[in-house]
A protein has these predicted regions:
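C-terminal nucleotide
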Residues: 2-122, 137-177
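Short beta-strand->loop micro-motif that forms the acidic, two-metal-ion catalytic signature
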Residues: 131-137
């Protein structure tokens, strides 16, 4: 669902997030030289430096480290056809992008909260945030009622309907052996 909020991706906003993550990584690497990138770190390592770095840097690093695990969880869940876990991790990603990495906006959070309230399996920010779209994992039986409700409630709150782009899971990209 497209909020129709234009991405105002101020490079300075992304630069601040990158700097936060680099700072957290540098503090972790000082104690764990094997850590070259934040993706090499664990939450245990991050917790070891929590008093050494600003709270904002901690939150942003927490999102990045958590997101790495969520991606791995989703890969495993997809191989097993476990869409409930996929959906749970999607909601976790949205929470992290909104509350920890701070790249969501009111409209995206509204659609995510509405999806959860409507029983949608999963929902998250799509792309870089600061506006744009959510992607939603919706069971076929809920699809029509969710779209109708989302359009009505979003319009009542923001004065316009979100755009809806239908996609269907397919055998698209896959591992070749």
């Amino acid at each position: 669902m497209d909020t129709v909020v234009k991405h105002e991706l101020a490079s300075s906003a992304y630069n601040r997030r990158r700097e936060s993550c680099e700072n957290a990584c540098a503090h972790i690497a000082a104690k764990h030289p094997e850590v070259k990138y934040l993706s090499d770190a664990t939450m245990t390592m991050l917790n070891e430096v929590d008093v050494e770095i600003p709270a904002e840097d901690y939150m942003r690093a927490e999102y990045v480290i958590g997101e790495k695990q969520r991606v791995l969880d989703v890969c495993d869940a997809l191989e097993k056809g476990d869409y409930e876990t996929v959906g749970d991790r999607m909601y976790g990603t949205h929470y992290g992008m909104s509350k920890l990495y701070e790249v969501s906006c009111e409209e995206l959070d509204f659609l995510n909260d509405l999806a959860k309230a409507c029983g949608v399996t999963g929902s998250r920010v799509m792309g870089g945030g600061f506006g744009g779209c959510t992607i939603n994992l919706v069971k076929e039986a809920l699809y029509d009622s969710f779209i109708k409700t989302a359009k009505e409630k979003f319009n009542a709150r923001f004065g316009h309907e979100p755009k809806v782009y239908d996609v269907v899971i397919s055998d698209g990209a896959r591992k070749i052996e």
